[in-house]
Amino acid sequence: GRVSRWEQDTNAWAVFFQGTYDIADNLSLTAGFRYTKEEKAAHAKTDLTQSNTGLATPNPNPYAAAIQAASFGSWAHEFKEDRSTNQFMPAFNLQWEASDSSNYYVSYSEGFKSGGFNAVDDQNPEFLADGTVLRTVPGPGFEYDDETASSFEIGGKHILMDGAMSFNWAYFDSEYLDQQVSTFVGLGFVVANAAPSDVSGLEVDMKMQASENLRLGANFAVLDATYGEFDSAGCTARQASDLLGALAQGLTSASGCDAQFTAAGQQSGSSQDISGGQQGAKYSGTLSADYSSVLDNGLIWFLSADLYFTDDYFMTGDLDPIDVQE
């Protein structure tokens, strides 16, 4: 067996500023920024245990260690790693009040999601070319980097039909660098960084008071969200299972999943190529209707109906066909 421990400390501070300048009576510019400094320190330890007592041993029997490695891909290790990041994120928003019933805006902003360390207990240490295990040096995949994004958006908000109807629209485009993608690996989720990806789309929504008692609503979205070059994505559970069978036959790939090895020839993981894969539903929307009426005794009764529709999409970042929502 094995006993695993995980501990992480995070220290962070940030400075934020935002201000608005009126260029004209109907034109204003809002600008701001956020500066963040973050430090993380992780302590990850896995001990192999005596099969009879369950007690951890710093010097496991080499045969027991070999069985653990062959069966579960797990080696005794102790990692003490730290990382720090600092990010400056500006934001700008230009708003134009064209009339009492129409407003337009254009905005640009940057953001980030901090990197960190994977907490699953089967993280493996590094190996030298001669097969020596460096138990205090983490192998590939233990740490993942910050995800950063820059976003552009333009849109409008309108009041129509003497206030009985509102209509809003927005077009957006976001570019991600080192996008963080979570993949289930059997004992937990592992986060890895994808190559650059782009997310763009158009959203429209409408609400209308059709009568004194009836209110209608609708919204529709078109989304184009694809991975860039992402040839190091985690394999699906089915692919990983097929790969184990392939390795037993001396092959290094199966079902689009390729084995990865250390310099010593030890398997250190697996990956697949999902470059250009779609990340979300291309089309989605809702339709709604609400009808209400006042009864003679002052009570209100109402009837509501909602319809939601969406295109096919993957529920997981590894684009597992079994996780397609239709």
Regions found by a protein language model. Name each.
Residues 97, 103-113, 119-121, 127-202, ...:
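Membrane-embedded beta-barrel scaffold of Gram-negative outer-membrane proteins
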Residues 3-12, 23, 39-41, 80-88, ...:
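Short sequence motifs at beta-strands and strand-loop junctions characteristic
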Residues 37-40, 91, 113, 157:
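A general lysine-centric signal
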Residues 25-26, 164-166, 170-175, 192-317:
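Gram-negative outer-membrane beta-barrel transporters
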Residues 1-5, 41-82, 118-142, 181-192, ...:
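Solvent-exposed loop segments that connect transmembrane elements
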